[in-house]
């Protein structure tokens, strides 16, 4: 692996799960849990004649950003599409639980715990969701992760990073939506049903998964930023994701809580208004939504640089 300083300028899109995990925290602070040398792999895959990975396609560990303990979860899309099975799911669950337990321990020792020391969880998503090979074990893992995220609400901030090749789809799309903050790059993709699955089930006339422009207009970072599914857009480098994460974590927990998409009656009302808008607007393309948000020439936003886009793009208000 490259040195930490070299990792900072590496493309987030191209980086491996381990590179993202190491690079997002301060230099030399990352300690991995259940790494490859521990050889904890899926018990289901060998029974089906499938290849295994000794980390089950997920890197988990802890590091620091300043004085703040950062529990990191990073998915590897190069292994079965970053899918979540029994072992990788258990690693996610336990890592979040460790962050929660540490927070409780720190507060018991120091009730007025400074914000700069509050533990946080950072999840770098690269996944198509549940690992179909492991069926209910993978589904159960999703439920247990969601349970831990809810347990952390108002106590331990959980930040999603989405900018890797596979994107974040399937059940993990629900998981990302349940976290406090979502940071994406323009190359990140977020959704529930992936483009290929939509085409397979509904036909190419309904959604052409080979049309990359269409895919990014529908699930990409710029679209998600305009409609409010994504809180922040970062450049395509580990450094940019790290800097954006650091900036978010400098905010008090009460403010971070306001960035959520779900979890309160107010948020439910906002979502209902968006559903009403989609019914009345009847958009044929994301460009219709961008225009409704106040972007007079929405097509011009597509090829803008990140800085230009952030300066000019108007976001949707329900």
UniProtKB/Swiss-Prot annotation:
Pfam entry (one): Carboxyl_trans
Any one GO MF annotation of this record: acetyl-CoA carboxylase activity
Residue span(s) of domain CoA carboxyltransferase N-terminal: 2-257
InterPro entries: AcCoA_carboxyl_beta, ClpP/crotonase-like_dom_sf, COA_CT_N, Malonate_beta
Coiled coil: none
GO cellular component: cytoplasm
Keywords assigned: Cytoplasm, Transferase
GO biological process, one term: malonyl-CoA biosynthetic process
EC identifiers of the protein: 2.1.3.10
UniProt-annotated location(s): Cytoplasm
Enzyme class: transferase
Protein name per UniProt: Malonyl-S-ACP:biotin-protein carboxyltransferase MADC
Main location: cytoplasm
Reaction equations catalysed: N(6)-biotinyl-L-lysyl-[protein] + malonyl-[ACP] = N(6)-carboxybiotinyl-L-lysyl-[protein] + acetyl-[ACP]
Alphabetical list of Gene3D superfamilies matching this protein: 2-enoyl-CoA Hydratase, Chain A, domain 1
Record function comment: Gamma subunit of the biotin-dependent malonate decarboxylase multienzyme complex (EC 7.2.4.4). The two subunits MADC and MADD are required for the transfer of the malonate carboxy group from the acyl-carrier protein (ACP) to the prosthetic group of the biotin carrier MADF. Required for the regeneration of ACP.
Domain of life: Bacteria
């Amino acid at each position: 692996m490259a040195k930490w300083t070299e990792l900072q300028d590496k493309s987030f899109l191209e980086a491996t799960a381990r590179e993202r995990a190491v690079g997002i925290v301060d230099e030399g602070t990352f300690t991995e849990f259940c790494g490859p040398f521990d050889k904890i792999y899926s018990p289901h895959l060998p029974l089906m004649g499938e290849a295994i990975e000794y980390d089950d396609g997920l890197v988990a560990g802890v590091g620091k950003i300043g004085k703040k303990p950062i529990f990191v979860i990073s998915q590897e899309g190069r292994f079965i599409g970053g899918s979540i099975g029994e072992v990788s799911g258990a690693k996610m669950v336990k890592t979040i639980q460790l962050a929660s337990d540490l927070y409780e321990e720190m507060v018991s020792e120091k009730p007025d715990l400074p914000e700069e020391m509050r533990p946080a969880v950072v999840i770098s998503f690269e996944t198509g969701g549940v690992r179909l090979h492991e069926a209910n074990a993978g589904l159960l893992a999703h439920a247990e992760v969601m349970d831990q995220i809810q347990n952390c609400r108002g106590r331990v901030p959980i930040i999603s990073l989405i900018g890797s090749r596979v994107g974040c789809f399937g059940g993990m799309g629900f998981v990302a939506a349940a976290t406090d903050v979502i940071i994406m790059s323009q190359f990140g993709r977020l959704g529930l049903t992936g483009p290929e699955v939509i085409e397979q089930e509904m036909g190419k006339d309904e959604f052409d998964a080979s049309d990359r422009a269409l895919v990014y207009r529908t699930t990409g970072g710029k679209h998600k930023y305009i409609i409010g599914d994504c809180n922040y857009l970062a450049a395509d480098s580990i450094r940019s994701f790290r800097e954006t994460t650091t900036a978010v974590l400098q905010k008090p927990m009460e403010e971070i809580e306001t960035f959520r998409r779900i979890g309160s009656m107010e948020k439910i009302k906002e979502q209902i208004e968006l559903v009403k808008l989609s019914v009345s607007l009847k958009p044929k393309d994301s460009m219709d939504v961008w225009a409704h948000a106040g972007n007079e020439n929405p097509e011009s936003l597509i090829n803008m640089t990140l800085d230009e886009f952030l300066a000019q793009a108007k976001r949707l208000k329900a």
